[in-house]
From Swiss-Prot:
The signal and the metalloprotease domain are cleaved during the epididymal maturation of the spermatozoa. Residues 178-375 form the Peptidase M12B domain. The lineage of its organism: Eukaryota, Metazoa, Chordata, Craniata, Vertebrata. Residues 16-680 are extracellular. This is Disintegrin and metalloproteinase domain-containing protein 2. The modification Phosphoserine is found at S723. One of its GO terms (cellular component) is plasma membrane. Residues 716-735 are annotated as: Disordered.
Length: 735
């Protein structure tokens, strides 16, 4: 059962009047003085400043903190609703964190991109610093960050203790660095509240992430801002109403539309005048692709410092870190980060001993695997692309190195633009500077649950990697698809133990996994303390194979464990806590464990949580649904619903790019005065003109003689009429 955490905030502090955090009476003008600089290449890796605060000089020691990937992008939508990246915002060399010398519990989070901007936290008071506008010198404004928190408190936290998977127990410390790759979305109203300017809003989000990293430094955890999305003109989903419903709507939306660079967790930041809640999150689910997301509500009067604390608390809860029990938990700061009061307090805030233990326990389990992926980071300090560095950057079509070393016939090395005769320079759908034909395979299917992708005929890049929707049956209906793989228990056994291995017998699984020791279990509570599988969960515990060989299985990285059950040799593996392969010890999430049931975190649960709502019947029983819930049709059936059949169509989906290429009829252009070459008409084109001309001549001749005949007859008739009318005229006149 998921524990959905909804956090209520103090109405008196977020919903009512709050003192402005910059008070005129506390403002000071200071001129920071750089006294130390350590460079690596052309970038300062360490720097120290003297800063005067209230007539006292302090030394702030800073170390560069990288949290933007080298290909970071800020996205928004154009008037047609198509997502587009903004200009380069990937400058990531100028963000620092550190402390104030002589104050061991202090914290500093500073940006030096354009002057100093950020936060200085002493034990009981915090100061904001930012450049003084229109200053001739290096003058800055420094001010105390204050909160009217006399009445601030959480009215309740809906945490069901029974659903907190990880109990706090002692565990050895770890120096391993963990990473959270985060995608942040700023909705329309918050975008306006933060300044209504892309550069301003982006800088504030950078400040937030920098502050979060300063808080998480004690856990050796880095938040990477994978990408930023701004909803400037309109929101993609309604952001009003109940925050619980908003979270579920956001999760549903991001499954279909959030297809940017890889990320572990996505957050929607929403502005509300006087919210009752500060956010919503799924507890302990940060690495779950279906539930790795959250909502954070920004009130009208909250400070950037407080909003950073809210995001840290929400992320912490998503990693299984509960709120502190004031009677049991302690920290070195004035107030602990996972205390409800931390949102509204000034001064240094640190994680408690309870939070540190909970985090270490979480990262020692297989459900924290996504935090172990180290993203590619390198200093990006050029605001403009550099042509000739062998890297395609913003504003470039291609980059093949210097003019001397470039061997790309499609790319102009001097401008990093395509040559006039080229349509593309690189990519699986580019061949000799031309796009490959629409429908040509550019990415083969790698699994029964994977789908092939095709060139679309208008780009050198391959289509997005698509796969069969999670929950679809595979391997003769025995297993199900999960993230493009058929989660076969037998395949996992062979991947883990060897290609000749077979899955353990029912007796192996049932008798071993109902124990609570190293041979079989349903999870590790703490080193040496194992959790026995319940009566319905033993198929989801330790992964076990049957072994009938005489030689010993060898595994240099883990411990191989043998057990004799009913005359069968049953084998499992034990990896040390935090090992990169520790997830292989247990049956994978999504493995079938019963009718309409699958394994999930060592429990056999209903498969309904997968949201398998797009079935072959949705596709008229002539296809399967892909991960975007669009039909991928069988050959000869036509997307989007696979209802109609056409023998000339190859099937596929509206996403895969393999709709058959329909050649455009050749267009004949009438040459104008600028073209002087003579035109040679083919003989077969002259014949129709000759026939038409002959018919016209014959028609004209016929009409001519017909008219002549009519005139002769008319003349004769006129004479007869005159002769007949004369007596009548005289007769009338005689009267």
């Amino acid at each position: 059962m998921l524990c959905l955490l909804l956090l209520l905030c103090g109405l008196a502090s977020l919903g009512g009047p709050l003192k402005k955090y910059v008070e005129n009476s506390g403002m000071q003008i200071t001129v920071p003085e750089k006294i130390r600089s350590v460079k690596r290449g052309s970038v300062e890796s360490e720097v120290s400043y003297k800063i005067v605060i209230e007539n006292t000089t302090y030394i702030v020691n800073l170390v560069r903190k990288m949290f933007l990937p080298h290909d970071f992008q800020v996205y928004s939508y154009d008037s047609a609703g198509i997502m587009k990246p903004f200009e380069d915002y990937s400058q990531n060399f100028c963000y620092y964190q550190g402390h104030i010398e002589g104050f061991p519990t202090s914290l500093a989070s500073i940006s030096t991109c354009a002057g100093l901007r950020g936060l200085l936290q002493f034990e009981t008071v915090s100061y904001g610093i930012e450049p003084l506008k229109s200053s001739i010198g290096f003058e800055h404004v420094i001010y105390p960050v204050k909160h009217d928190n006399e009445k601030s408190q959480y009215l309740k936290k809906s945490i069901n203790v029974k659903n907190v998977v990880y109990k706090i127990k002692s565990i050895k410390s770890s120096v391993r660095t963990h990473y959270i790759e985060m995608h942040i979305i700023v909705e329309k109203n918050l975008y306006k509240h933060m300044g209504g300017n892309t550069a301003t809003v982006t800088e504030k989000i950078f400040q937030l992430v920098g502050l979060m990293n300063a808080f998480f430094s004690t856990l050796n955890l880095t938040v990477i801002l994978a990408s930023l999305e701004l909803w400037i003109d309109e929101n993609k989903i309604p952001t009003t109403g109940d925050v619980n419903e908003l979270l579920h709507a956001f999760q549903k939306w991001k499954k279909s539309y959030l297809v940017l660079r890889p990320h572990d967790v996505a957050f929607l930041l929403v502005y509300r005048e006087s919210p009752s809640y500060i956010g919503a999150i799924f507890q302990g689910m940060i690495c779950n692709t279906s539930y790795g997301g959250g909502i954070a509500l920004h009130s009208k009067t909250i400070t950037l410092d407080s909003f950073g604390v809210i995001l840290v608390q929400l992320l912490s809860v998503s990693m299984g870190i509960a709120y502190d029990n004031a009677d049991l938990c302690r920290c070195r700061g004035a107030i602990c980060l996972m205390s409800p009061e931390a949102v509204f307090s000034s001064g240094m805030k640190m994680f408690s001993n309870c939070s540190v233990k909970a985090f270490k326990l979480f990262t020692s389990s297989q459900v924290s695997q996504c935090l172990q992926n180290q993203p590619y980071l390198e200093p990006v300090y050029r605001s403009n692309p550099v042509c000739g560095n062998n890297r395609v950057e913003q504003g470039e079509d291609c980059d093949c190195g210097s003019q001397e070393e470039c061997q790309d016939t499609c790319c102009d090395a001097a401008t990093c633009r395509l040559k006039s005769t080229s349509r593309c320079a690189q990519g699986p759908c580019c061949n000799q500077c031309e796009f490959k034909t629409k429908g040509e395979v550019c990415r083969e299917s790698t699994d029964e649950c994977d789908l092939p992708e095709y060139c679309n005929g208008s780009s050198g890049a391959c289509q997005e990697d698509l796969y069969v929707i999670n929950g679809h049956r595979c391997a003769n209906e025995e297993w199900i698809c999960m993230n493009g793989r058929c989660l076969s228990g037998k395949a996992q056994v062979q991947e883990t133990f060897g290609t000749e291995m077979e899955m353990g017998s029912v007796d192996c699984f049932e008798q071993l996994n109902t124990k609570n020791d190293i041979t079989g279990n349903c999870g590790i509570l703490s080193p040496g303390n194992y959790k026995a599988c319940g009566a319905s969960n033993w198929k989801c515990g330790k992964l076990i194979c049957s072994y009938d060989k005489s030689e010993i299985l060898r595994n240099k990285e883990g411990m191989t464990i043998y057990a004799n059950i009913s005359g069968h040799i049953c084998v499992s593996i034990e990896y040390p806590p935090g090992h990169a392969k520790s997830a292989l010890m247990w049956v994978r999430d999504g493995t079938v464990c019963g009718p309409s049931e699958v394994c999930r975190q060592q429990q056999c649960v209903s498969s309904s949580y997968l949201g398998y709502d797009c079935t072959p019947a949705t596709c008229s029983d002539h296809g399967v649904c892909n991960n975007k819930r669009h039909c991928h049709c069988n050959p000869t059936y036509v997307p989007p619903n696979c209802e109609t059949q056409d023998s000339t169509k190859p099937g596929g989906s509206v996403d895969s790019g393999n709709l058959r290429y329909e050649p455009i009829p050749e267009t004949y252009f009438v040459e104008g005065a600028y073209h002087t070459k003579s035109r040679k008409w083919p003989f077969f084109l002259i014949i129709p003109f000759f026939v038409i001309f002959s018919v016209l001549v014959a028609t004209v001749v016929k009409v001519y003689y017909q008219k002549k005949k009519w005139k002769t007859e008319d003349y004769a008739n006129d004479e007869n009429i005159e002769s007949e009318s004369e007596p009548k005229s005289s007769k009338v006149s005689s009267k």
